[in-house]
Protein backbone atom coordinates (compact mmCIF):
# COMPACT_ATOMS: atom_id res chain seq x y z
CA UNK A 1 0.00 0.00 0.00
CA UNK A 2 1.30 3.43 -0.91
CA UNK A 3 1.29 5.71 2.13
CA UNK A 4 -1.19 8.09 0.51
CA UNK A 5 -3.82 5.88 -1.12
CA UNK A 6 -5.96 4.42 1.66
CA UNK A 7 -9.69 5.06 1.40
CA UNK A 8 -10.04 5.47 5.17
CA UNK A 9 -8.02 5.62 8.36
CA UNK A 10 -9.85 4.15 11.36
CA UNK A 11 -8.83 5.49 14.77
CA UNK A 12 -9.68 2.94 17.46
CA UNK A 13 -8.92 -0.78 17.32
CA UNK A 14 -11.56 -2.07 19.72
CA UNK A 15 -14.33 -4.39 18.64
CA UNK A 16 -16.43 -1.81 16.77
CA UNK A 17 -13.51 0.01 15.15
CA UNK A 18 -12.13 -3.31 13.97
CA UNK A 19 -15.53 -4.39 12.64
CA UNK A 20 -15.93 -1.18 10.65
CA UNK A 21 -12.39 -1.47 9.29
CA UNK A 22 -13.11 -5.05 8.21
CA UNK A 23 -16.34 -3.92 6.53
CA UNK A 24 -14.56 -1.18 4.58
CA UNK A 25 -11.75 -3.52 3.55
CA UNK A 26 -14.22 -6.22 2.54
CA UNK A 27 -15.73 -3.66 0.16
CA UNK A 28 -12.39 -3.64 -1.67
CA UNK A 29 -10.92 -0.51 -0.09
CA UNK A 30 -7.47 -0.12 1.42
CA UNK A 31 -8.01 0.75 5.10
CA UNK A 32 -5.57 1.68 7.85
CA UNK A 33 -6.49 0.68 11.41
CA UNK A 34 -4.69 2.51 14.23
CA UNK A 35 -4.80 1.76 17.94
CA UNK A 36 -3.16 3.51 20.87
CA UNK A 37 -1.42 0.37 22.17
CA UNK A 38 1.51 -0.71 19.93
CA UNK A 39 1.54 -4.19 21.49
CA UNK A 40 -2.13 -4.66 20.63
CA UNK A 41 -1.53 -3.53 17.04
CA UNK A 42 1.46 -5.88 16.75
CA UNK A 43 -0.74 -8.74 17.96
CA UNK A 44 -3.44 -7.88 15.42
CA UNK A 45 -0.82 -7.80 12.69
CA UNK A 46 0.60 -11.16 13.75
CA UNK A 47 -2.77 -12.88 14.14
CA UNK A 48 -4.48 -11.11 11.21
CA UNK A 49 -7.62 -11.03 13.33
CA UNK A 50 -8.81 -9.37 16.53
CA UNK A 51 -8.60 -12.48 18.69
CA UNK A 52 -9.80 -10.67 21.81
CA UNK A 53 -13.09 -9.40 20.36
CA UNK A 54 -13.67 -10.94 16.92
CA UNK A 55 -11.65 -14.17 16.88
CA UNK A 56 -13.48 -15.85 14.01
CA UNK A 57 -13.14 -13.02 11.47
CA UNK A 58 -9.84 -12.91 9.52
CA UNK A 59 -8.65 -9.53 8.26
CA UNK A 60 -8.95 -8.88 4.51
CA UNK A 61 -5.64 -8.32 2.76
CA UNK A 62 -6.52 -4.65 2.25
CA UNK A 63 -6.75 -3.98 6.01
CA UNK A 64 -3.44 -2.52 7.19
CA UNK A 65 -2.40 -2.19 10.84
CA UNK A 66 -0.47 0.88 12.00
CA UNK A 67 0.84 1.90 15.41
CA UNK A 68 2.36 5.21 14.31
CA UNK A 69 -0.35 7.87 14.38
CA UNK A 70 1.32 10.24 11.92
CA UNK A 71 1.72 7.48 9.35
CA UNK A 72 -1.88 6.37 9.82
CA UNK A 73 -3.25 9.88 9.35
CA UNK A 74 -1.09 10.54 6.29
CA UNK A 75 -2.63 7.53 4.58
CA UNK A 76 -6.08 9.02 3.94
CA UNK A 77 -7.99 12.28 3.95
CA UNK A 78 -10.98 10.54 5.52
CA UNK A 79 -10.69 9.66 9.20
CA UNK A 80 -13.17 7.44 11.06
CA UNK A 81 -12.96 7.85 14.85
CA UNK A 82 -14.28 4.94 16.92
CA UNK A 83 -13.33 5.61 20.54
CA UNK A 84 -15.30 5.89 23.80
CA UNK A 85 -17.11 9.22 24.16
CA UNK A 86 -15.20 10.26 27.28
CA UNK A 87 -11.90 10.37 25.33
CA UNK A 88 -13.35 11.70 22.05
CA UNK A 89 -12.15 15.29 22.53
CA UNK A 90 -8.75 14.15 23.75
CA UNK A 91 -8.25 11.98 20.66
CA UNK A 92 -9.27 14.80 18.31
CA UNK A 93 -6.79 17.17 19.92
CA UNK A 94 -4.14 14.48 19.54
CA UNK A 95 -4.75 13.94 15.83
CA UNK A 96 -5.30 17.57 14.79
CA UNK A 97 -1.63 18.54 14.18
CA UNK A 98 -1.06 15.33 12.18
CA UNK A 99 -4.11 15.48 9.91
CA UNK A 100 -3.83 16.24 6.21
CA UNK A 101 -4.92 19.70 5.07
CA UNK A 102 -7.81 18.16 3.11
CA UNK A 103 -8.95 15.92 5.98
CA UNK A 104 -12.58 15.01 6.64
CA UNK A 105 -13.77 13.48 9.91
CA UNK A 106 -16.51 10.95 10.62
CA UNK A 107 -17.18 9.24 13.93
CA UNK A 108 -19.04 6.17 15.11
CA UNK A 109 -18.70 7.15 18.77
CA UNK A 110 -22.03 7.19 20.60
CA UNK A 111 -22.41 9.59 23.48
CA UNK A 112 -22.00 13.16 24.64
CA UNK A 113 -19.02 15.01 26.07
CA UNK A 114 -18.11 13.87 29.57
CA UNK A 115 -19.36 16.18 32.35
CA UNK A 116 -20.74 18.90 30.03
CA UNK A 117 -23.27 16.89 28.00
CA UNK A 118 -22.28 18.71 24.81
CA UNK A 119 -22.93 17.11 21.44
CA UNK A 120 -19.84 15.60 19.85
CA UNK A 121 -20.19 18.00 16.91
CA UNK A 122 -19.44 20.85 19.32
CA UNK A 123 -16.45 18.98 20.72
CA UNK A 124 -15.18 18.37 17.18
CA UNK A 125 -15.61 21.99 16.14
CA UNK A 126 -13.76 23.19 19.22
CA UNK A 127 -10.89 20.77 18.63
CA UNK A 128 -10.60 20.98 14.84
CA UNK A 129 -12.10 24.30 13.79
CA UNK A 130 -15.09 25.23 11.67
CA UNK A 131 -13.81 24.35 8.20
CA UNK A 132 -13.39 20.57 8.33
CA UNK A 133 -16.33 18.51 7.02
CA UNK A 134 -17.89 16.38 9.76
CA UNK A 135 -20.08 13.29 9.70
CA UNK A 136 -21.51 10.70 12.06
CA UNK A 137 -22.70 7.13 11.58
CA UNK A 138 -25.08 5.51 14.03
CA UNK A 139 -27.58 2.69 14.21
CA UNK A 140 -28.22 -0.88 15.38
CA UNK A 141 -24.79 -2.44 14.96
CA UNK A 142 -23.28 -5.14 17.12
CA UNK A 143 -19.63 -5.46 16.15
CA UNK A 144 -19.64 -9.25 15.97
CA UNK A 145 -22.53 -9.39 13.49
CA UNK A 146 -21.18 -6.52 11.39
CA UNK A 147 -17.74 -8.14 11.15
CA UNK A 148 -19.32 -11.48 10.23
CA UNK A 149 -21.06 -9.84 7.28
CA UNK A 150 -24.58 -10.35 8.62
CA UNK A 151 -27.21 -7.90 7.28
CA UNK A 152 -26.97 -4.52 9.02
CA UNK A 153 -28.28 -1.00 8.39
CA UNK A 154 -27.21 2.39 9.76
CA UNK A 155 -27.88 6.11 9.43
CA UNK A 156 -25.29 8.58 8.18
CA UNK A 157 -25.43 12.35 8.61
CA UNK A 158 -22.86 14.91 7.49
CA UNK A 159 -22.32 18.65 7.37
CA UNK A 160 -21.39 18.41 3.69
CA UNK A 161 -23.61 16.57 1.16
CA UNK A 162 -20.64 15.44 -0.93
CA UNK A 163 -18.97 13.95 2.14
CA UNK A 164 -22.19 12.08 2.93
CA UNK A 165 -22.33 10.63 -0.58
CA UNK A 166 -18.66 9.65 -0.51
CA UNK A 167 -19.06 7.87 2.82
CA UNK A 168 -22.20 6.10 1.68
CA UNK A 169 -20.33 4.83 -1.38
CA UNK A 170 -17.40 3.61 0.75
CA UNK A 171 -19.49 1.84 3.39
CA UNK A 172 -22.57 0.61 1.56
CA UNK A 173 -22.56 -3.04 0.47
CA UNK A 174 -25.65 -4.38 -1.26
CA UNK A 175 -25.05 -7.86 0.14
CA UNK A 176 -24.96 -6.98 3.82
CA UNK A 177 -24.57 -3.32 4.83
CA UNK A 178 -27.14 -0.63 4.03
CA UNK A 179 -26.24 2.98 4.72
CA UNK A 180 -29.06 5.55 4.76
CA UNK A 181 -28.20 9.24 4.47
CA UNK A 182 -30.13 11.38 6.94
CA UNK A 183 -29.91 15.20 6.85
CA UNK A 184 -30.50 15.51 10.62
CA UNK A 185 -26.96 15.83 12.00
CA UNK A 186 -28.13 16.53 15.54
CA UNK A 187 -30.69 13.74 15.73
CA UNK A 188 -28.36 11.03 14.43
CA UNK A 189 -25.82 11.99 17.10
CA UNK A 190 -28.30 12.15 19.95
CA UNK A 191 -30.02 8.82 19.43
CA UNK A 192 -26.87 6.84 20.10
CA UNK A 193 -26.32 8.52 23.45
CA UNK A 194 -29.82 8.24 24.85
CA UNK A 195 -30.37 4.63 23.77
CA UNK A 196 -27.46 3.51 25.96
CA UNK A 197 -29.20 4.98 29.01
CA UNK A 198 -32.54 3.36 28.23
CA UNK A 199 -30.83 0.02 27.58
CA UNK A 200 -29.53 0.02 31.14
CA UNK A 201 -33.09 0.60 32.31
CA UNK A 202 -34.41 -2.24 30.14
CA UNK A 203 -31.77 -4.51 31.59
CA UNK A 204 -32.72 -3.48 35.12
CA UNK A 205 -36.36 -4.27 34.40
CA UNK A 206 -35.51 -7.73 33.13
CA UNK A 207 -33.07 -8.31 35.97
CA UNK A 208 -35.81 -7.55 38.47
CA UNK A 209 -38.06 -9.98 36.61
CA UNK A 210 -40.75 -7.57 35.44
CA UNK A 211 -41.28 -9.31 32.10
CA UNK A 212 -41.81 -8.42 28.45
CA UNK A 213 -44.69 -5.97 29.01
CA UNK A 214 -42.59 -3.80 31.30
CA UNK A 215 -39.56 -3.92 29.01
CA UNK A 216 -41.64 -2.85 26.02
CA UNK A 217 -43.26 -0.02 27.97
CA UNK A 218 -39.85 1.20 29.08
CA UNK A 219 -38.48 1.12 25.53
CA UNK A 220 -41.49 3.05 24.25
CA UNK A 221 -41.32 5.71 26.94
CA UNK A 222 -37.57 5.84 26.48
CA UNK A 223 -38.15 6.70 22.83
CA UNK A 224 -40.42 9.52 24.02
CA UNK A 225 -37.60 10.88 26.19
CA UNK A 226 -35.17 10.64 23.28
CA UNK A 227 -37.56 12.50 20.97
CA UNK A 228 -38.36 15.11 23.62
CA UNK A 229 -34.68 15.91 24.14
CA UNK A 230 -34.08 15.93 20.41
CA UNK A 231 -36.89 18.41 19.82
CA UNK A 232 -35.35 20.77 22.37
CA UNK A 233 -32.10 20.66 20.38
CA UNK A 234 -33.82 21.25 17.05
CA UNK A 235 -33.64 17.67 15.77
CA UNK A 236 -36.23 16.23 13.38
CA UNK A 237 -38.65 13.92 15.28
CA UNK A 238 -38.73 11.52 12.30
CA UNK A 239 -35.04 10.75 12.84
CA UNK A 240 -35.89 8.92 16.05
CA UNK A 241 -38.13 6.54 14.12
CA UNK A 242 -35.12 5.50 12.02
CA UNK A 243 -31.94 3.49 12.45
CA UNK A 244 -30.21 5.94 14.80
CA UNK A 245 -33.25 6.15 17.06
CA UNK A 246 -35.78 3.33 17.31
CA UNK A 247 -33.53 0.86 15.51
CA UNK A 248 -30.58 1.24 17.86
CA UNK A 249 -32.87 1.51 20.88
CA UNK A 250 -34.67 -1.78 20.23
CA UNK A 251 -31.45 -3.64 19.49
CA UNK A 252 -29.63 -2.43 22.58
CA UNK A 253 -32.58 -2.96 24.91
CA UNK A 254 -33.46 -6.49 23.81
CA UNK A 255 -30.28 -8.43 22.99
CA UNK A 256 -27.71 -9.63 25.48
CA UNK A 257 -24.84 -8.73 23.17
CA UNK A 258 -25.45 -5.23 24.56
CA UNK A 259 -23.08 -4.43 27.41
CA UNK A 260 -25.47 -1.72 28.61
CA UNK A 261 -28.35 -4.19 28.84
CA UNK A 262 -26.25 -6.83 30.62
CA UNK A 263 -24.97 -4.19 33.04
CA UNK A 264 -28.55 -3.17 33.84
CA UNK A 265 -29.60 -6.78 34.33
CA UNK A 266 -26.89 -7.25 36.94
CA UNK A 267 -28.07 -4.14 38.76
CA UNK A 268 -31.65 -5.40 38.64
CA UNK A 269 -30.49 -8.66 40.18
CA UNK A 270 -28.95 -6.79 43.09
CA UNK A 271 -25.31 -6.42 42.09
CA UNK A 272 -23.62 -3.11 42.95
CA UNK A 273 -22.49 -0.73 40.20
CA UNK A 274 -18.74 -1.33 40.49
CA UNK A 275 -19.06 -5.11 40.60
CA UNK A 276 -21.32 -5.06 37.54
CA UNK A 277 -18.84 -2.91 35.61
CA UNK A 278 -15.99 -5.21 36.59
CA UNK A 279 -17.92 -8.26 35.46
CA UNK A 280 -18.67 -6.73 32.05
CA UNK A 281 -14.94 -6.14 31.57
CA UNK A 282 -15.34 -3.55 28.78
CA UNK A 283 -16.52 0.05 28.61
CA UNK A 284 -20.22 0.42 29.50
CA UNK A 285 -20.93 3.63 27.59
CA UNK A 286 -24.36 4.05 29.17
CA UNK A 287 -22.84 4.54 32.62
CA UNK A 288 -21.22 7.83 31.60
CA UNK A 289 -23.94 8.64 29.07
CA UNK A 290 -26.54 8.70 31.85
CA UNK A 291 -24.79 11.54 33.63
CA UNK A 292 -24.19 13.40 30.35
CA UNK A 293 -27.78 13.07 29.11
CA UNK A 294 -29.08 14.19 32.50
CA UNK A 295 -26.83 17.28 32.41
CA UNK A 296 -28.07 18.16 28.92
CA UNK A 297 -31.72 17.60 29.84
CA UNK A 298 -31.43 19.79 32.93
CA UNK A 299 -29.73 22.53 30.93
CA UNK A 300 -32.55 22.48 28.37
CA UNK A 301 -35.33 22.08 30.94
CA UNK A 302 -36.48 18.75 29.49
CA UNK A 303 -38.11 16.24 31.84
CA UNK A 304 -36.70 12.71 31.42
CA UNK A 305 -38.00 10.61 34.33
CA UNK A 306 -36.54 7.28 33.18
CA UNK A 307 -33.12 8.83 32.74
CA UNK A 308 -33.41 10.45 36.16
CA UNK A 309 -34.20 7.19 37.93
CA UNK A 310 -31.37 5.37 36.17
CA UNK A 311 -29.06 8.18 37.30
CA UNK A 312 -30.28 7.72 40.87
CA UNK A 313 -29.36 4.03 40.72
CA UNK A 314 -25.95 4.55 39.11
CA UNK A 315 -24.74 7.57 41.07
CA UNK A 316 -26.85 7.90 44.22
CA UNK A 317 -27.14 4.33 45.46
CA UNK A 318 -30.85 3.85 44.80
CA UNK A 319 -32.00 0.24 44.46
CA UNK A 320 -33.18 -0.68 40.95
CA UNK A 321 -36.54 -1.99 42.17
CA UNK A 322 -37.17 1.25 44.10
CA UNK A 323 -36.38 3.26 40.97
CA UNK A 324 -38.86 1.18 38.98
CA UNK A 325 -41.56 1.66 41.59
CA UNK A 326 -40.93 5.42 41.54
CA UNK A 327 -41.60 5.45 37.80
CA UNK A 328 -44.69 3.29 38.13
CA UNK A 329 -46.03 5.53 40.88
CA UNK A 330 -45.86 8.76 38.89
CA UNK A 331 -49.05 10.79 38.49
CA UNK A 332 -51.51 9.85 35.75
CA UNK A 333 -50.81 11.67 32.48
CA UNK A 334 -51.89 12.08 28.89
CA UNK A 335 -49.63 9.84 26.78
CA UNK A 336 -48.59 12.78 24.63
CA UNK A 337 -47.91 15.23 27.45
CA UNK A 338 -44.53 16.97 27.56
CA UNK A 339 -43.58 15.61 30.98
Curated annotation (Swiss-Prot):
Coiled coil: none annotated. GO terms for molecular function: glycerol-3-phosphate dehydrogenase [NAD(P)+] activity; NAD binding. The active site is at 195 (proton acceptor). One of its GO terms (biological process) is glycerophospholipid biosynthetic process. NADPH binds at residues 15-16, 36, 110, 143, 259, 283, 285. It is found in: Cytoplasm. InterPro entries: 6-PGluconate_DH-like_C_sf (IPR008927), 6PGD_dom2 (IPR013328), G3P_DH_NAD-dep (IPR006168), G3P_DH_NAD-dep_C (IPR006109), G3P_DH_NAD-dep_N (IPR011128), NAD(P)-bd_dom_sf (IPR036291). Disulfide bonds: none annotated. It is an enzyme of class 1 (oxidoreductase). Its EC number is 1.1.1.94. GO terms for cellular component: cytosol. The keyword Plastid does not apply. Its main location: cytoplasm. Pathway: Membrane lipid metabolism; glycerophospholipid metabolism. Keywords: Cytoplasm, Lipid biosynthesis, Lipid metabolism, NAD, NADP, Nucleotide-binding, Oxidoreductase, Phospholipid biosynthesis, Phospholipid metabolism. Sn-glycerol 3-phosphate binds at residues 110, 139, 141, 195, 248, 258-260. HAMAP family: NAD_Glyc3P_dehydrog. Catalyzes the reduction of the glycolytic intermediate dihydroxyacetone phosphate (DHAP) to sn-glycerol 3-phosphate (G3P), the key precursor for phospholipid synthesis. Belongs to the NAD-dependent glycerol-3-phosphate dehydrogenase family. This is Glycerol-3-phosphate dehydrogenase [NAD(P)+]. It comes from Klebsiella pneumoniae subsp. pneumoniae (strain ATCC 700721 / MGH 78578).
Amino acid sequence: MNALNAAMTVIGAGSYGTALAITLARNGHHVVLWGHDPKHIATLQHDRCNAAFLPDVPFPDTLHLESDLATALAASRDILVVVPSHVFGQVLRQIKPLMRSDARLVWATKGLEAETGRLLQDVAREALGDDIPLAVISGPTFAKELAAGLPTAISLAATDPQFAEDLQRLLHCGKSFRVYINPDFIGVQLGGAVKNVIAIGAGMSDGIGFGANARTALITRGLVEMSRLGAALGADPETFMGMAGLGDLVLTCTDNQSRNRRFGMMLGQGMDVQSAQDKIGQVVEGYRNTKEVRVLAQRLGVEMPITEEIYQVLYCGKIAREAALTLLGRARKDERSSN
